[in-house]
UniProtKB/Swiss-Prot annotation:
<keyword id="KW-0378">Hydrolase</keyword>
<protein>
    <recommendedName>
        <fullName>Putative zinc metalloprotease BH06270</fullName>
        <ecNumber>3.4.24.-</ecNumber>
    </recommendedName>
</protein>
<keyword id="KW-1133">Transmembrane helix</keyword>
<keyword id="KW-0812">Transmembrane</keyword>
<dbReference type="GO" id="GO:0006508">
    <property type="term" value="P:proteolysis"/>
</dbReference>
<dbReference type="InterPro" id="IPR036034">
    <property type="entry name" value="PDZ_sf"/>
</dbReference>
<feature type="transmembrane region" description="Helical">
    <location>
        <begin position="332"/>
        <end position="354"/>
    </location>
</feature>
<dbReference type="GO" id="GO:0004222">
    <property type="term" value="F:metalloendopeptidase activity"/>
</dbReference>
<feature type="transmembrane region" description="Helical">
    <location>
        <begin position="89"/>
        <end position="111"/>
    </location>
</feature>
<feature type="active site">
    <location>
        <position position="8"/>
    </location>
</feature>
<dbReference type="InterPro" id="IPR008915">
    <property type="entry name" value="Peptidase_M50"/>
</dbReference>
<keyword id="KW-0479">Metal-binding</keyword>
<feature type="binding site">
    <location>
        <position position="11"/>
    </location>
    <ligand>
        <name>Zn(2+)</name>
    </ligand>
</feature>
<keyword id="KW-0997">Cell inner membrane</keyword>
<keyword id="KW-1003">Cell membrane</keyword>
<keyword id="KW-0472">Membrane</keyword>
<dbReference type="Pfam" id="PF13180">
    <property type="entry name" value="PDZ_2"/>
</dbReference>
């Protein structure tokens, strides 16, 4: 619920900043459990069905963005009386706050606990793997991948996982000499740790291990990085940007039929993962919350009503053309978008169970 609260708080706070008055701030849908009305006249609610939330602004009786074909009176301080850029900012604020919330969580994580990282050095190979075929040797160090700096083995694995079948240009260091090579990770099927078989990229390199105990990492290549607040903020922003770009990349591949649909998490799979992660400790749950918050923000930016991105598109068109899209056209697009979203939700739910039992 905290992710939903952050999302709706974004709409509410930026709406207030733009001079738009809110009549309702609700966590959940359906019958009210508890609530109170503040001095500004906003009713704060906790509702029975915890599947989302909403902010209802004055003069926007159909919800946050107004889809009714009926003309509503323009009242000072209402959503309808606001300039298009203010309405766009209010709509965009929800997903933006989700991303900022992730940055806040990760900044706290890096500043308080730091980061244990394995240096990106080749410690072993999988036989006949793409890395072997490319001529890599033990002790080779990864410097860059497709122009991005490689700071840890985790960075390397995260990137390769999402780029199975795609050529990746690596900048490597060997005995003080820098060279460039292109490696195409092969696509393999593996267990994702949550009972699903998924496809992912495999390059075939392993971490450096202790020569005296191959079951342990070589301590010479393990470093505990401590961050000042400024560095923690920069690292958190960098990590959040990476999550956003890889999520967008994944969705593009999924829609293009190039990604394993079992990597998509619907509501039931998300709850299952959250429960399993919570059993491993607070830090793991905190990290999962950061990832989930960005996911909620990005999904809401899809340019399809009733998602935020659909209404944001309406307001951007109004900014460009100088006049709003007619209420009738908005309502038609809304109904089509709602059907699409419901179908996608049904697919995500069915996909969860299909991937569990297939």
């Amino acid at each position: 619920m905290i992710i939903i609260f952050v999302h709706e708080a974004g709409h509410y706070l930026i709406g207030r900043w733009c001079g738009i008055k809110a009549s309702v701030f609700s966590l959940g849908f359906g019958p009210q459990i508890v609530g109170y009305t503040d001095k500004r006249g906003t009713q704060w609610r906790l509702a029975l069905i915890p599947l989302g939330g909403y902010v209802k602004f004055i003069g926007d009786e159909e919800g946050l963005h107004g889809t009714s074909s009926q003309s509503l009176p323009i009242v000072d301080g209402s959503f309808g009386s606001a300039h298009a850029w203010k309405k766009a900012a209010t709509v965009f604020a929800g997903p933006l706050f989700n991303v900022l919330f992730t940055v806040v969580i990760l900044t706290f994580f890096f500043f308080t606990y730091g980061r244990v990282a394995i240096e990106p050095v080749v410690g072993s190979f999988v036989k006949d793997s793409p890395a072997v075929q490319a001529g890599l040797q033990l002790g080779d160090r990864f410097i860059e991948m497709d122009g991005q700096q490689v700071e840890s083995f985790e960075d390397l694995m995260n990137y390769v996982t999402f780029h199975g079948g795609d050529p990746i240009e690596f900048k490597m260091e060997r005995s003080g000499q820098v060279f460039t090579t292109v490696i195409t990770p092969k696509v393999v099927e593996r267990d994702d740790g949550f009972g699903n078989r998924v496809r992912s990229g495999l390059m075939g390199v392993g971490v450096p291990v202790d020569p005296d105990n191959p079951a342990r990492l070589d301590p010479a290549y393990v470093k505990h990085i401590r961050y000042s607040f400024g560095r923690a903020l920069r690292e958190a922003s960098k990590r959040a940007t990476f999550i956003v770009t890889q999520t967008v990349f994944f969705m593009g591949r999924l829609l293009g039929g190039k990604e394993d649909h079992c990597r998509l998490s619907g509501p039931s799979k998300t709850v299952k993962i959250a429960w399993q992660v919570s059993e491993t400790g607070f830090l793991s749950l905190l990290n999962f919350t950061a990832f989930l918050s960005i996911g909620v923000g990005l999904i809401n930016l899809f340019p399809i009503p009733p998602l935020d991105g659909g209404y944001l598109l309406f307001h951007v068109v109004e900014i460009i053309t100088g006049r709003p899209i007619s209420a009738k056209i908005r309502e038609i697009i809304f109904r089509l978008g709602l059907c699409f979203v419901l179908l996608f939700m049904f697919f995500a739910l069915f996909n969860d169970y299909f991937c569990w039992f297939s």
